Amino acid sequence: MECVSVEGLDSSFLEGQTFGDILCLPWTIIKGIRERKNRNKMKIILKNVSLLAKSGEMVLVLGRPGAGCTSFLKSAAGETSQFAGGVTTGHISYDGIPQKEMMQHYKPDVIYNGEQDVHFPHLTVKQTLDFAISCKMPAKRVNNVTKEEYITANREFYAKIFGLTHTFDTKVGNDFISGVSGGERKRVSIAEALAAKGSIYCWDNATRGLDSSTALEFARAIRTMTNLLGTTALVTVYQASENIYETFDKVTVLYAGRQIFCGKTTEAKDYFENMGYLCPPRQSTAEYLTAITDPNGLHEIKPGFEYQVPHTADEFEKYWLDSPEYARLKGEIQKYKHEVNTEWTKKTYNESMAQEKSKGTRKKSYYTVSYWEQIRLCTIRGFLRIYGDKSYTVINTCAAIAQAFITGSLFYQAPSSTLGAFSRSGVLFFSLLYYSLMGLANISFEHRPILQKHKVYSLYHPSAEALASTISSFPFRMIGLTFFIIILYFLAGLHRSAGAFFTMYLLLTMCSEAITSLFQMVSSLCDTLSQANSIAGVVMLSIAMYSTYMIQLPSMHPWFKWISYILPIRYAFESMLNAEFHGRHMDCGGTLVPSGPGFENILPENQVCAFVGSRPGQSWVLGDDYLRAQYQYEYKNTWRNFGIMWCFLIGYIVLRAVFTEYKSPVKSGGDALVVKKGTKNAIQRSWSSKNDEENLNASIATQDMKEIASSNDDSTSADFEGLESTGVFIWKNVSFTIPHSSGQRKLLDSVSGYCVPGTLTALIGESGAGKTTLLNTLAQRNVGTITGDMLVDGLPMDASFKRRTGYVQQQDLHVAELTVKESLQFSARMRRPQSIPDAEKMEYVEKIISILEMQEFSEALVGEIGYGLNVEQRKKLSIGVELVGKPDLLLFLDEPTSGLDSQSAWAVVKMLKRLALAGQSILCTIHQPSATLFEQFDRLLLLGKGGQTIYFGEIGKNSSSVIKYFEKNGARKCQQNENPAEYILEAIGAGATASVQQNWPDIWQKSHEYANINEKINDMIKDLSSTTLHKTATRASKYATSYSYQFHHVLKRSSLTFWRNLNYIMAKMMLLMISGLFIGFTFFHVGVNAIGLQNSLFACFMAIVISAPATNQIQERATVAKELYEVRESKSNMFHWSLLLITHYLNELPYHLLFSTIFFVSSYFPLGVFTEASRSSVFYLNYAILFQLYYIGLALMILYMSPNLQSANVIVGFILSFLLSFCGAVQPASLMPGFWTFMWKLSPYTYFLQNLVGLLMHDKPVRCSKKELSLFNPPVGQTCGEFTKPFFEFGTGYIANPDATADCAYCQYKVGDEYLARINASFSYLWRNFGFI
């Protein structure tokens, strides 16, 4: 890299959007135009960065968050596509090959490993590693080993290096699905990246979540690989120990995107000390180098250099560019450029890739295995993923079986006469509609980051995964579909022939797969789930309306008729109808006109079958005539349609694969701080004045920091007064066991200890030792077999324990739409007793904001990573949320320094120390404590493998007590400048490859220290229990506040999340607005003929069907709040779970009422029906108010009874299909089996539909079109009116030509109420139905 600079669009400071921006759209547009120039403002991401990393070298990249370390690695790896408006200048080459050419032809050799651990959670560790190894399996292997031997050898190699052998059969998991520990998941990520076999690795904070010993082993493993294989490694490490630092050859230091040093690791410290900065005692070199870039960092300045050393990023950069070290670097780069043989490098790469590529791989492809092998491997992985998540498949299959029984029995043995024709069409349409609804459940975005990572690793084409997912999921979908069609087909009494059955089976399968692929194609085009659900909702409407069941081809308007031809369901429905009705003779039954009293002996030529497709004088209707007249269908098109569906299926699959392959990730301009609406200008002015002051007084600030650093660290600030704990927490012989495939697995083994007020206890151990498990067990957050005693002041814990303790989780989970201050205020109000005045709570919140130094971003929205708070700010918020609850018993913290740089980690631990000195009791797990961090703790609990205690006791001054314990029990002597934490972990054999002879858990059990601790615990229990027996149960309430108080504040929080989630609100608005227009203009001017009555029915039916995609939207949004509550808020007993559901419901209502009003206007009036207020207002009341009240509640009820969102989508499809089946639209109640008529009465959709249709049809005169009239001849000498007069005394309809003596034209309906009666509805039921609803 030579003089590389990167610029991107400056989105670092944004103002959050709200729904108010839409309500005030004109002003929003004007404001947007005014700020257009600022939106295009560029910011420096990297400036003038140079580096020479030779083969076999390791380069450490240091800098604070926001310094540009990640951007530096991405630039080096060629992963700059996510830089919005990014402009890269300078020169980047790889042994002489320019970066552009490298990315085109040799990309697999450059690997970027991101900080986040994204994996398929339901795959095991073994399956995850095997897949990565298989994708990079060379065609020519050493000693001609088999593929299986190659995979096994490599898997065991990586597992041994990173200590993953014992986790092979454990799921990888994620934040919401249990699996391996966070540290083990990071090791899986590292092993997977190494399996990608790059020659240049860019590791972004790869040691995050690893304990010190494993982090060191990682560094040494990379060191070994660079030495043996000649690879190059660029690594960012936020908390690097001295041992880790010494494994690197070179180091570069970044400060606000500027490079301030690049050279050998042995020279960096001298460079900055010569500059004037001194390294404090026992501070590692990496900490020292990072601290220099922090104005508030822990560093000292040589006497006399206070006003000479650089302070700002620009000053540091200028010093570096003028230094002899920089000149030497430039010289080395120029020399290497002249020495490198580019052509030889290309030849080597080409030869290597040629030997590795398997047969069938394209010559220009940079993937190792062929495209077909990629599909095979991804398909196998797909089967394993589905098998690992059995609940979805089980729910899907059970739903299909249940739906088949219900629908089949609903249409049980449909009449073979004309009376059953509509039912037979309905059951076929419904089967297609059900699997269309199921297709909505396949819209998912959770795996997109994994595909992007694997694309970076060059494991496989993203399109290969798209094709493989289709293949792997097909058999599992077929299980449910097969049961569905068998049960439905025979219960409904469809055409009993093998040919017809298998034709139906084939057509339903083909259509189901095509529609599923269509929805997956839609999702591959979209950036967000809300966006995909909105588009899918409109597609769903198209599928339902233009299948030709609801509105037939002759009735379609030309502006939308084309839609019918581009959807597979239209062709499937035609072919299924042909298979069912071809050659069928349908007896007219009760549809002969005239008939009844007085017409018993009438001749056949004087009657007609009042049914579509009838012929004069014929008492039956041929199925082919019916299809031709009603739908314009021809039997000869049956297998033509099958071919067309094949084309649709292949087309959708191919398009999805193409979109997946070339879809770019969402671009960004780096971390963006998003502030609350209306606060941007004030905050910008504050920041501007602050920055100016810092620049003018930088040297004074640095000198102040020197004085602070040298002051007494144990001084207690008055800010922390009132934070003291009031109880002693004791745990004795705590064990935790979970079920395992091999029996019971013990994760904790007789762990004992205690926390007293005023102490800071460290919980340390290697990754997977059980640190988080112990923390969760003590905090009452684990589910399993727990034995032992956990006592508060010597007594068993009561219901108030959870709310009296604070728990800072490793994952920083917060409500994205709230500001930092609002998040803290909500926690304070929910966690502290209601008796405390609100003003006092808010004052305390301000105090915590000041303590944690969050004033600068207190009005910023939490947002998401990259578009909201950064990692450090999120961690501070996580701690603050617990502190404002003022836990009076204990504060648990799980890895509070994970993901932070050394300076941020130092600030967090120092703050914890001050809390402890103020009287707080703290138990904290920590992975990579430096010497300076470790010595801030008072007491240590050390866990070994299997959750066994190795040490519990005082750490001592300069860690003397704990060091003395290990040295006297056989460990080597600890060096004076050695990190005690690393020494301890090394002594006990922590790490993947380490081993020791001593049995440290056994040594502890037999030690004098263990006896003393046990005795002390017993004495404490005895003394405390005797002094606390007089306490009352006033604290034992589960919640700190009343239900009504919780309701008020949870409702307020929920309303803010809706108001500020513009993407969700806009998606909802677009769905209802576009759907309204779509329905309105599909059934535009329904007319007064008979088909207009049917169209009116289906227009109302489709208005109800809108609830399906709208329900998916509601559930997708509610899932975010539900998961946050389950993972964090419920564990602290903040508020009752029911309030989450109730407040979400109440906040959905106003938006649905507004948007359903838009839907009403855009759909009702285009129909050309009654516009007087007496009808339209009641229609509005029924649909835009009552119906919205109903299905919002239904959506939330289903979600809260489901294990996850995907399962909820399946259940929604099942329940809505159930409700729509029995509402009377596709099967009139008169044709339902007697058993199911209760369900017709029980379904709320029945009454909604009856009201909507009744308002449209009551007193509406009907005038049949010419083709709707049925013709017959009266007896000789009689007119049509005279002949049919007795019939109309009890029959419906009218004669269009009563004075004619031949060709009597009969219309089936005279007024809309007659059609209502046929579907068992009546306008008179209107207010009765309102009561039922």
From Swiss-Prot:
Keyword Nucleus: no
Subcellular location: Membrane
UniProtKB keywords: ATP-binding, Glycoprotein, Membrane, Nucleotide-binding, Repeat, Transmembrane, Transmembrane helix, Transport
UniProt GO MF annotations: ABC-type xenobiotic transporter activity; ATP binding; ATP hydrolysis activity
Record-annotated membrane-spanning stretches: 13-33, 392-412, 425-445, 474-494, 499-519, 534-554, 642-662, 1071-1091, 1092-1112, 1150-1170, 1178-1198, 1210-1230, 1235-1255
PROSITE patterns assigned to the protein according to its UniProt record, in alphabetical order: ABC_TRANSPORTER_1, ABC_TRANSPORTER_2
Secretion signal, residue range per the UniProt entry: none
Record domain ABC transporter: where: 30-281, 729-971
Glycosylation sites: N48, N144, N205, N350, N697, N733, N958, N1320
Pfam family, one: ABC2_membrane_7
Family membership noted in the UniProt record: Belongs to the ABC transporter superfamily. ABCG family. PDR (TC 3.A.1.205) subfamily.
Protein name: ABC transporter ATP-binding protein/permease PDR18
Originating species: Saccharomyces cerevisiae (strain ATCC 204508 / S288c)
